[in-house]
Amino acid sequence: GQDENKYDGFLQSSLYQEIFCNDFLGQVPPIDLKKEKQFHDFVMKLNDNEIINSAHDISDGGLLPCMIEMLLFNKLGIDINLPTKIQTPNEENLLFLHGWLFGEDQSRIIISTNKPDKLMEFSKSENIKIYCIGKTNNTGVVEIPKYDSICINKCLDLYNNTIPKLFP
């Protein structure tokens, strides 16, 4: 539901705001119900036409947590394709990067496919904006170029062991 020109994200009333700011204030992300329905119909058509392997909305935690959830159990990695505006690390871009990675904007879904050309063609015919956020690989590392990297095995360990450690 977005293209490369969308490089910020909605952080008000988000999990990010709650964790990093110890706050949960502000408006919830705005939603255009007509656009939302169009977008979900589009994803259903992609599925019906066997163009996608999986789809996951980013509403809880944003793009990065969603990507990690999708990669976790297959221990895959991804080279993230950052929007041009935030590819150069500096203070302003770091703020935009956090919004892009953790914003809980509506009408954003991560789709995995083995048919990227068909996906692009179909999105144009349906007038839906899409952006290739990256390509998966077998490294087990989420690579955020020029910023950071995240080891999927560490995420899997946290996923499997956090609750047992808190409640022995």
Which positions does each model-derived feature cover?
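C-terminal transmembrane module of polytopic alpha-helical membrane proteins
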Residues: 31-38
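Glycine-/charge-enriched secondary-structure boundary and capping motifs
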Residues: 25-27, 40, 46-168
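Mobile "lid/hinge" segments at catalytic clefts and subdomain interfaces of large enzymes
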Residues: 1-31, 44-47, 105-106, 113-115
